């Protein structure tokens, strides 16, 4: 085993361990903000695995789209919408965790069986190199144009939903419920109010 192969093997195990531990943290940690940050580490670990496979374009897309867009959007939504409220205890939580663990172990066994019994295609003798990015672009905007546009629409819908939820938190809904006030009479906070608040924070800093 050469030094380069040994280094690649060490990087693979390190990235795999980071990915697995981060994924477990996303599911098991009670703090949703920590889970969102660990989700970003999972995305970065996947990008590192892509780099080990010489797929630099896919790794860059992973970082730009999932870390730079999706994960940041999730963090903004959590920090804008997150309310400190006590969650109700889920009945039968231990039984649900047990069955969830059984299902996960079953999926793991199935994936391991597929990975060991499938005859995978051999890597070609000539790597694509820089032409790989060109071919990905050609397929992305020709054969896979519809899924590409659908993904962009889903991201746009997620952004609009986060903005709508954040705007709802700025409006006091208690008078509407108690006094039955017409929602049309409620004035939303204006942009000047946000500028005044930001100016005060800047002066305080």
Curated annotation (Swiss-Prot):
Gene3D superfamilies: NADH-ubiquinone/plastoquinone oxidoreductase chain 6, subunit NuoJ (1.20.120.1200). Belongs to the complex I subunit 6 family. This is NAD(P)H-quinone oxidoreductase subunit 6, organellar chromatophore. GO terms for cellular component: organellar chromatophore thylakoid membrane; plastid. NDH shuttles electrons from NAD(P)H:plastoquinone, via FMN and iron-sulfur (Fe-S) centers, to quinones in the photosynthetic chain and possibly in a chloroplast respiratory chain. The immediate electron acceptor for the enzyme in this species is believed to be plastoquinone. Couples the redox reaction to proton translocation, and thus conserves the redox energy in a proton gradient. It catalyses: a plastoquinone + NADH + (n+1) H(+)(in) = a plastoquinol + NAD(+) + n H(+)(out); a plastoquinone + NADPH + (n+1) H(+)(in) = a plastoquinol + NADP(+) + n H(+)(out). The keyword Magnesium does not apply. Its main location: plastid. GO terms for molecular function: NADH dehydrogenase (ubiquinone) activity; quinone binding. The keyword Transmembrane applies. It is found in: Plastid, Organellar chromatophore thylakoid membrane. Coiled coil: none annotated. NDH is composed of at least 16 different subunits, 5 of which are encoded in the nucleus. Keywords: Membrane, NAD, NADP, Organellar chromatophore, Plastid, Plastoquinone, Quinone, Thylakoid, Translocase, Transmembrane, Transmembrane helix, Transport. It is a multi-pass membrane protein. InterPro entries: NADH_UbQ/plastoQ_OxRdtase_su6, Nuo/plastoQ_OxRdtase_6_NuoJ. Its EC number is 7.1.1.-. The chain crosses the membrane at residues 9-29, 32-52, 61-81, 90-110, 145-165. It holds the Pfam family Oxidored_q3.
């Amino acid at each position: 085993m050469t030094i380069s192969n040994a280094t690649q093997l060490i990087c693979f195990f390190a990235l795999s361990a980071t990915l697995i531990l981060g994924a477990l943290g996303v599911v098991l940690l009670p703090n949703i903000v920590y889970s969102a940050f660990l989700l970003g580490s999972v995305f970065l670990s996947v990008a590192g695995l892509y780099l080990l496979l010489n797929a630099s374009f896919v790794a860059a897309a992973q970082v730009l789209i999932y870390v730079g867009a999706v994960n940041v959007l999730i963090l903004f939504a959590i920090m804008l919408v997150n309310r400190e409220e006590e969650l109700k205890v889920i009945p039968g939580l231990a039984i649900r965790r047990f069955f969830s663990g059984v299902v996960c172990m079953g999926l793991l066994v199935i994936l391991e069986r597929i990975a060991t019994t499938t005859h995978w295609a051999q890597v070609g003798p000539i790597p694509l190199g820089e032409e790989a990015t060109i071919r990905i672009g050609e397929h992305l905007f020709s054969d896979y144009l519809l899924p590409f546009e659908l993904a962009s629409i889903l991201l746009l819908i997620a952004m609009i939903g986060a903005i709508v939820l954040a705007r709802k938190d700025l409006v006091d809904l208690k008078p509407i419920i108690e006094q039955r006030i017409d929602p049309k009479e409620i004035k939303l906070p204006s942009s000047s109010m946000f500028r005044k608040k930001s100016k005060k924070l800047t002066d305080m800093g």
